């Protein structure tokens, strides 16, 4: 079917914040001209492990996905993109990097890891992968969270044990169920869908959304559109 016309306005920003000495967020955003048309590829990782270790974990995973984008994606574009092929290749990257980061951490004597949100956007489809508690939002007529937090409180909310309001103040809200480099096996969440016209996609780490509420994100959109 007909896809949406892709015109891109891209903005990326990262900040150390007020309580850390190092910035453990890493990100990359690329506009791609492929034989199947223009695409956007974005990856954001939020590392943990103290000082430089979290930064190493997040940057190494971003680099692995950048390599996929430059080396593997052009090959895939020779034929129509398939959900399962993207899923398998991304899961392989996560699996390999989970082991590499874990081994590096053991050598350094530290526990380290990183969250990840990855998005490939074409005029027909979006492909999303999520590990941990970074998020991807879709902001059109209303704001919707496309990813599901892989956290203890996220699971409790999903099971109906606590409310969204209770989750925001629960002291376990930063406890991850999944983390690249710290989990024995990582089970990424995969999401596939069709992009809508006049829509903003927001990739953000937990530090951003703990400071800025969903309501503020939505109202900011209304003030600039």
Go through each PLM region and give its residues.
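PP2C/PPM-type serine/threonine phosphatase catalytic domain
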Residues: 1-225
């Amino acid at each position: 079917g007909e896809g949406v016309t892709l015109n891109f306005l891209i903005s990326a920003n990262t900040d150390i914040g007020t309580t850390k000495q190092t910035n453990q967020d890493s990100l990359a955003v690329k506009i791609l001209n492929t034989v199947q048309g223009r695409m956007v590829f974005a990856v954001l990782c939020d590392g943990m492990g103290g000082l430089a270790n979290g930064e190493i974990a997040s940057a190494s995973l971003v680099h692995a996905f950048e390599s996929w984008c430059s080396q593997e994606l052009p090959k895939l574009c020779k034929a129509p993109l398939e959900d399962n092929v993207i899923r398998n290749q991304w899961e392989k990257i996560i699996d390999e990097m989970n082991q590499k980061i874990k081994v590096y951490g053991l050598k350094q004597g530290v526990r380290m890891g990183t969250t990840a949100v990855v998005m490939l956007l074409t005029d027909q489809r979006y492909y999303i992968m999520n590990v941990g508690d970074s998020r991807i939002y879709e902001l059109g007529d209303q704001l919707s969270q496309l990813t599901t937090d892989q956290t203890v409180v996220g699971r409790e909310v999903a099971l109906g044990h606590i409310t969204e309001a209770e989750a925001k103040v629960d002291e376990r809200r930063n406890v991850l169920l999944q983390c690249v480099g710290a989990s024995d096996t990582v089970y990424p969440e995969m999401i596939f869908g069709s992009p809508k016209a006049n829509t903003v996609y927001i990739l953000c780490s937990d530090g951003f959304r703990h400071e800025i509420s969903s309501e503020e994100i939505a109202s900011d959109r209304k003030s600039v559109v």
